[in-house]
Design a protein with these regions (language model features):
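Bacterial N-terminal signal peptides that target proteins for export
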Residues: 1-11
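Short, flexible coil/linker elements and helix-boundary hinge sites characteristic
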Residues: 5-6, 18-19, 126
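Bacterial N-terminal signal peptides
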Residues: 9-21
Length: 304
């Protein structure tokens, strides 16, 4: 009898703290409908595009580690380096300050200074094609229109609630632009801070092989000048990329870390001075970013 008396009291307490008119709202909050998801993704992509230029307003350190694997997937070599990203003649420039955890040798320091001076001269002459930012494969801009979006769950990430959304390419047999065709090679998972309407993390995976032409920084053998050459990269199915961002100074969303891993990579040089030789090398590239400082001083190199 005591149990029968307590049950109505328990139900009364439930009704008091969780009244029925709140039940539908709680249900909807637990799993947004497809229109709500699409609108949220459209907003965060717009914010993502607008925030990309913010990185050029900061100096920072980029800590990079490159690991190669053998045919059995075991690591066979690792190289690490730290670059100081500064503002040189008005635009970002990366200067290596550590190699494999150690300061540069006097000769390496001399080479870095020569490269900086050569780059400064080139920029003063109007040439500026020095890639600094980490290349990120994920087709984020195409998310609202070229992917089927599925809400998965909520979780806490660094103390903030984020919504996890899965993005699968739309499977349609129709003519496609180059951007649409590119998007069809990926599936992605998003971590979204809905309160800020910002993408906090993205993980992507290549689901069908994709080939890209990319500009890469190169140095002349005598270290007299730097330049950019076009290489062709084939990213195999199973290649994964990820990036996470954090809010800096309560004003800018900037990269916190990034990673890239491929089971197989085919690289073909397209420069006229090098043969087109494929290179197969499974590898992983990880980077963390730290010491962000709002740009204050531009570096100028006085010509000798």
């Amino acid at each position: 009898m005591a149990g029968r008396v307590q049950l109505p009291r328990l139900l009364l307490l439930v009704m008091l703290f969780f009244p029925p008119h709140l039940w539908p709202q709680r249900s909807r909050a637990a799993k947004p409908d497809s229109d709500t998801i699409t609108e949220l993704v459209r907003r965060v992509v717009a914010n993502y595009k607008s925030r990309e230029a913010q990185l050029d307003n900061y100096t920072y350190l980029a800590h990079v580690a490159r690991t190669e694997f053998d045919g059995n997937g075991k690591p066979k070599g690792k190289i690490t380096g730290t670059d100081e990203i500064m503002i040189l003649e008005g635009t970002p420039y990366g200067r290596t300050v550590l190699l494999n955890g150690r300061p540069l040798s006097p000769e390496q320091e001399r080479q870095q200074q020569m490269l900086l001076e050569a780059e400064a001269s080139a920029r003063r002459a109007g040439y500026n094609n020095h890639p600094v930012h980490n290349f990120f494969l994920a087709p984020i801009v195409q998310l609202p229109d070229e992917f089927r979006l599925r809400w998965r769950s909520r979780q806490l990430l660094r103390g903030h609630e984020v919504q996890i959304i899965e993005a699968l390419p739309i499977d349609e047999q129709r003519p496609a632009s180059s951007d649409q065709e590119y998007a069809r090679h990926f599936k992605m998972t998003l971590w979204i801070d809905a309160d800020e309407a910002q993408i906090v993390r993205v993980e992507s995976e290549v689901i069908s092989s994709v080939t890209l032409d990319q500009n890469l920084f190169e140095v002349s053998p005598d270290v007299k000048f730097s330049g950019v050459h076009t290489w062709r990269f084939e990213y195999a199915r199973g290649t994964t990329t990820a990036m996470e961002w954090t809010k800096v100074n309560d004003e800018a969303w900037l990269p916190k870390w990034s990673s890239w891993k491929t089971p197989k990579e085919t690289v073909t040089a397209l420069t006229p001075t090098k043969p087109a030789v494929p290179i197969h090398s499974p590898e992983q590239l990880t980077a963390t970013y730290s010491d962000y400082k709002k740009f204050r001083v531009d570096t100028h190199v006085v010509p000798k």
